[in-house]
Curated annotation (Swiss-Prot):
GO terms for biological process: RNA repair; tRNA 3'-terminal CCA addition. HAMAP family: CCA_bact_type2. This is CCA-adding enzyme. Belongs to the tRNA nucleotidyltransferase/poly(A) polymerase family. Bacterial CCA-adding enzyme type 2 subfamily. It is an enzyme of class 2 (transferase). Its EC number is 2.7.7.72. SUPFAM superfamilies: Nucleotidyltransferase (SSF81301), Poly A polymerase C-terminal region-like (SSF81891). ATP binds at G8, R11, R91, R137, R140. The lineage of its organism: Bacteria, Pseudomonadati, Pseudomonadota, Gammaproteobacteria, Enterobacterales. CTP binds at G8, R11, R91, R137, R140. GO terms for molecular function: ATP binding; CCA tRNA nucleotidyltransferase activity; magnesium ion binding; tRNA binding. It comes from Buchnera aphidicola subsp. Acyrthosiphon pisum (strain APS). Its cofactor is Mg(2+). It catalyses: a tRNA precursor + 2 CTP + ATP = a tRNA with a 3' CCA end + 3 diphosphate; a tRNA with a 3' CCA end + 2 CTP + ATP = a tRNA with a 3' CCACCA end + 3 diphosphate.
Amino acid sequence: MKIYLVGGAVRDSLLNLPVKDKDWVVVGGTEKILLERNFQQVGKDFPVFLHPETHEEYALARKERKSGKGYTGFDTDCNSDVTLEEDLIRRDLTINAIAQDEYGNYIDPFQGKKDIECGLIRHVSESFIEDPLRVLRVARFAATLVHLGFKIAEETMLLMCIIVKKQELSYLTSNRIWNETEKALKTLNPHVYFQVLYECNALHFFFPEMYFLYEKKNFLNRSFFKKFCNKNIILMGLAEISLLNKDIDVRFSYLCQFLSVNQIDRNYSKIFFDSYAASIIHSVCKRFKIPSYIRDIAVLNTGFYFFLNTIHYQSSKNIINLFSKVDAWRKPDRVKKLAFLSNFNFLRNFKSEFFCIKSGCFLEKCFSVVKNVSIKLILKKGFKGYEIKQEITRLRIKKLEFWRIKNIKHRFYL
């Protein structure tokens, strides 16, 4: 029985990246042998075991044969006569199909080390097309490694297009799709993930709402789309904010905000909350079971998009109402996130009409002015029940209005 280090640990070590998890493949072993050595079996579809001390994953070498549809439609063979190369050939990419023995020697039958040196993301074999999940994985690896100069091999991109054309993507669960997307949003360049999905024609399947943005024919105001909302502007913006903010909810919300742009012909200066745009985001989040902390910021930012970008012209009453609607009194961090997003919105291109670059700063300043209005003083005055809420709202509006009048000459409220 021989044991080899495989997968991401070998790849990341060769790339001089931090090794997070170590996965091992066992050649010539059996379930019985590993159980006798106190390994704990955890795999359902195929034998995977946890080491009794390190708790690292050890999988029996296996072969796979396509027997159905989707990423689960495989029969596996985990017999002790399965070779290391037979195990490695079933893997998705050459850079993930390198093994290392106990002496540090590399076993690299598919030239993964060479592809690492050349910065190439390339499939191992033609069986790549049998697993639709690989479309998402390749897009994620492209986002993960682009800063190191990696690109997808042309022949691999062609196979991804074939997977899409064969409609294999329909067999992926929403959970699988979101898991890969969430990982991509954590990378240094999440915009690359969506660009790759667009290029292989998969974006419209996974995110039809987002694909809508790529087609100017869908827009009421096509000249507006051409100038401000083409895919390059959208993805460049995501790249820009990703340099400044690592929060997944902020990055995801940035993409979602563009779903409001087709409302541009409406009288947006009078919109308080765009329930239609917000409902689209809510539907996306429900479909993928996206965590509530991400959903909430995305829905709020999209719904209040036009209000936030005309906030200088809004009444103090409406601004206080905004803080209440976003639950800012209990969750002040939401104001910070919405302010950040407001400073990176597509409407900032209208510099002559809006003070958009400063809208986020203004929002935060407004909140700092009113957040400390004392409830204790209101209670001392004898207010009860609903009267308490009415009075604290009145005092907040009054305090904000006083500050705005006092600072009216400072147009940008710095």
